[in-house]
């Protein structure tokens, strides 16, 4: 599925703005999609609906279906064109109708879907567009939610007390997310109506090599001839070819590298009959060799942030202003990488990372797969087929982005209590990712703090990615003990002869809280936490990167472990740097992107 663009052959109409909105229930088809929604209120699209009306808690705590509606008119000059309705994402399950006719259904809240509406939307006609989205999470969704009677992530309980058990049975149905970020829902990314000629370009794949050869494949409908031209960054034609697939050689090729290098971008300009499409790409290689990660043949060190799509008012909704702000802060911090924890981000963010030279670890929404020793998720959770779907959709969507250098299959599953079942679940996904990716990027699985000696899955990934909270959730506040424990574990990973990086580590920090002795939750402790652990990373030649948790404070489900969300951000939620950020900014300024541990 190509990203929609407007050019001489294609028209793109934004349907973003203020829509009509109504909360539903757990009844799937509660409202008639052919009629106006009853008692509708205004809602902004794209955005989460949860925080748009503080006069009521109903939106914030909603459980079930929510309904959107607006009218759509196709201009008369679109006559004779194919017409497609496209959603960047709807969380988590979506149904879409035009004039009451069901045209699309999609499960998964972080990847796009579309419907050909040529036969239903005639030029000059106005129709009623209705969208329903279901925010419920459970053992069959990604991310995973807990079922009735279970707790939300970091929830508390006094199991066995009669009054508590009775209250749980009497409680209203609600989401119990098994993940540590707020379960925002709604139409989160742009909605567009776009046109193409009747015979059109359906898909484009680009596989560049650092010697300047570029393999390409163009999927089309119909039999019109295909012509491709490579344009350099100034728009000059530097190579061309005929046919739906082949190899082009770019003379004196410029390579794509993260900043402070040059993230050089080319454009593959494609014509097919009356249709035209431009696909940007960068020429770079990425591979694992021994205990090194090589980008363009040079040993790479990741200096990165884990992030969330999370901000006040619009929740997880797409915000180009915030994306630009965050990318500039990433540059200011002297970082070079982002992990899309814990789901694929908006497509436009990857375009920005391509342009701005930021490396991306691209992650599926597979978070929360595990419930302790009492529950085997690999036998009891019906997830495998949906997991394959979201992995395939992510790779197909993001395959041409030079910024994407690593696929993450998921975050912190249970890998120790049922080790063989875990391996049997995750290893086929590892193989599938390699099969699906035409550029054959490295693949990883981000593992949580566990008994790593029992985990037989993480060690089989191309890069070992470990989330560890030595000094915070365990050995709390004792950084001497934390460093000792970390080194005990790092000795184990040294024996695996793989590149290893810290994919998540951090300390909750209340902005403005200062203590003389670097006590937990203070800004001074955040500095001490990173200073001590980072010094241990630097001693290991096979340690290839660090992704701090988190870029900014963010909202979570309420519970006794969270006060107004997760405070591990190096920036506050409104993007003010904490003391720890100033420390890391100086550290990262002294670490080169290439050759740090040659």
Regions found by a protein language model. Give the residues of each.
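Short hydrophobic/aromatic-enriched beta-strand-loop microsegments
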Residues: 106, 357-364, 462-468
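Secreted/periplasmic carbohydrate-active enzymes, especially glycoside hydrolases
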Residues: 1-347, 352, 356-360, 390, ...
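The substrate-binding groove and active-site-proximal loops of carbohydrate-active enzymes
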Residues: 109, 176, 180, 308-321, ...
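Catalytic metal-binding/acid-base residues of hydrolase active sites
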Residues: 134-136, 343, 365, 410-414, ...
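Feature marks short, surface-exposed loop/turn motifs that line or immediately flank catalytic pockets
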Residues: 91, 135-137, 287, 308-309, ...
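Substrate-binding clefts and catalytic carboxylate motifs of secreted carbohydrate-active enzymes
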Residues: 7-31, 171-172, 179-186, 193, ...
